[in-house]
Design a protein with these regions (language model features):
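Dinucleotide-binding/catalytic capping subdomain of oxidoreductase cores
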Residues: 66-70, 92, 192-355, 427-439, ...
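Glycine-rich dinucleotide-binding loop and its adjacent helix/turn
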Residues: 141-226, 382-392
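C-terminal, flexible cofactor-proximal segment of oxidoreductases
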Residues: 396-498
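N-terminal mitochondrial targeting presequence
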Residues: 1-41, 498
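FAD-site-proximal beta/loop scaffold in flavoenzymes
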Residues: 153-171, 321-324, 341-407
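Short hydrophobic core segments
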Residues: 129-137, 183-185, 357-367
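N-terminal Rossmann-like dinucleotide/flavin-binding domain of flavoprotein oxidoreductases
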Residues: 75-131, 280-305, 311
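N-terminal Rossmann-like FAD-binding beta1-loop-alpha1 element of flavoenzymes
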Residues: 42-65, 191-199
């Protein structure tokens, strides 16, 4: 028999002949679940989105002795990759293949349908594991804080995105798309995703969406949509826009649409471009060309035939959402006109001028917020993050964070990958220095799954998820789609537990 040598940076563990036969078989995957050694560092990750999986991936690759469990509130993994990435960006979802390899690694287990903070506490996880990593993302919405934001026809972008992407708690959203004009507040990538989807029922583009994993109810609603004009509003100027050039280029080239810009929003921009970093310069030049230059013959013809329009509106902040008389239905949004002041950083200042924009749909895309899942944890309610230093949670030894709960909802998936790797490196440094004591025997998932059973919670394993995955892909094949997502937790559990 060959005996494994498990190396870390400073320690050597040998599975020797003096151990019993049963101990020699620990670390082998049986029936889709890993059986682990009691003497190895045990780590659990809370959340199975990019932050959680990238942290797990780095730990498993860098520490051949670490044993890792991932806990997820929903029965299905992958978080924002499944529920946040736009359906017309399928290439971004390819990262799921890498995450699947991590989840199926012999030293990793996945436990879905476990609500940490309700089904099991952070302290209980700390008792069972040497280290706990919080990677549960940002489930809350930043509110506008203006009168009328609770009117019918006003939605958070997170909920709208969740609706067309199949997030279970958003399936009943049923947004009213019977109006002509929609206003999106915020100018990040999510705002532009929403704009593209709203303008989708056009010629061949709706046919393209039919080949994605957008949910069937959303596809049917969009096919009947009356939205013909989308305005994307930001409180600062073109040089401060938060989206990337890829998303702007997609808007410029969106079939059946034409841009509708205000030239005044771009006054003086050309003169300062020489001092702007190259990526920002290229993005701004594309906006300038779209807004100010006379299009060529082919582009002019395309714009003339367009039945829908979109445009950025800069230097505007929401003041109030207005209702139709004697109803609670949105009829317009009142915007304050801003000017920019530079005092170390660029900020928008009210001018006192306001304007009303007639619309029946308002979507607020001004940011997500992380939520506190355990009162024993520190939390910065203003920034909506867990206070940390390189992923080490303040005043909470052995507990770390990664992803948006660490940094706030910023950047793209690659940004989350880097910050998650940083957290994993911090943990490994602490293991090596002794700041994180991994010498004590910990029970890991053995005690947690027993505790959950006693509380009537039945976790979903990765093998169970693969049953759900199989059902979704088969349903999708029948419709010419990569998958047709199950839309309720009940449906998911029914499939997983059969």
């Amino acid at each position: 028999m060959n005996y494994k040598l498990l190396f870390s940076h400073r320690k050597l563990w040998t599975l020797g002949r003096r151990r019993s036969t049963s101990r020699l078989h620990e670390g082998i995957r049986v029936s889709g679940q890993a059986l682990f050694s009691s003497c190895s560092p045990k780590v659990c990750v809370v959340g199975s989105g990019p932050g959680g999986f990238y942290t797990a991936q780095h730990l498993i690759k860098a520490r051949p002795d670490v044993e890792l469990d991932i806990y997820e509130r929903l029965p299905v993994p992958f978080g924002l990759v499944r529920f946040g990435v736009a359906p017309d960006h399928p290439e971004v979802k390819n990262v799921i293949n890498t995450f699947t390899q991590t989840a199926k690694h012999s030293r990793c287990n996945f436990y879905g349908n476990v609500n940490v903070g309700r089904d099991v506490t952070i302290n209980e996880l700390k008792e069972a594991y040497h280290a706990v990593v919080l990677s549960y993302g940002a489930e809350g919405n930043r509110t506008m804080g203006v009168p009328g934001e609770d009117l019918a026809g006003v939605y958070a972008a997170k909920d709208f995105v969740g609706w067309y992407n199949g997030l279970p708690n958003c399936r009943e959203l049923n947004p009213d798309l019977s109006c002509e004009t929609a206003v999106i507040l915020g100018q990040g990538n999510v705002a532009l995703d929403v704009a593209r989807i709203l303008l989708a029922p056009i010629n061949d583009y709706i046919l393209f969406l039919q080949s994605t994993d957008i949910t069937q109810p959303a596809l049917e609603a969009l096919a009947q949509s009356q939205v013909r004009r989308v305005l994307i509003v930001g409180r600062r100027g073109p040089l401060q826009i938060a989206c990337t050039i890829k998303e702007i280029r997609e808007m410029v080239n969106l079939p059946g649409t034409k841009p509708e810009m205000l030239p005044a929003d771009f006054e003086g921009i050309s003169e300062v471009l020489k001092d702007v970093p190259r990526p920002r310069k290229r993005l701004t030049e594309l906006m300038l060309k779209t807004a100010l230059e006379t299009p060529g013959e082919k582009e002019l013809e395309r714009r003339k035939s367009a039945s829908r329009s979109w445009g950025f509106r800069f230097f505007r902040s929401p003041v109030e959402v207005l209702a139709e008389p004697r109803t609670n239905k949105t009829s317009a949004i009142r915007l304050a006109v801003n000017r920019l002041e530079v005092e170390g950083f660029t900020r928008a200042v009210l001018t006192g001028e306001v304007e009303d924009v007639t619309c029946g749909l308002v979507i607020s895309s001004i940011g997500y917020r992380s939520l506190l899942i355990d009162p024993g944890l520190p939390f910065d309610s203003r920034k909506a993050i867990i206070p940390n230093s390189m992923g080490r949670i303040q005043h909470t030894p052995g507990v770390y964070c990664s992803g948006w709960v660490k940094t706030g909802p910023t950047g793209v998936i690659a940004t989350t990958m880097n910050n998650s790797f940083d957290t994993a490196r911090s943990m490994m440094e602490d293991m090596d220095s002794g700041a994180l004591d991994v010498s004590a025997v910990k029970s890991g998932s053995q005690s947690i799954t027993a505790l959950l059973r006693g509380r009537g919670v039945k976790p979903v394993t990765f093998a169970d998820w693969e049953k759900i995955d199989s059902v979704e892909t088969k349903k999708g094949e029948a419709e010419g789609k990569p998958r047709e997502k199950l839309l309720s937790v009940e449906e998911m559990l029914q499939v997983a537990q059969t």
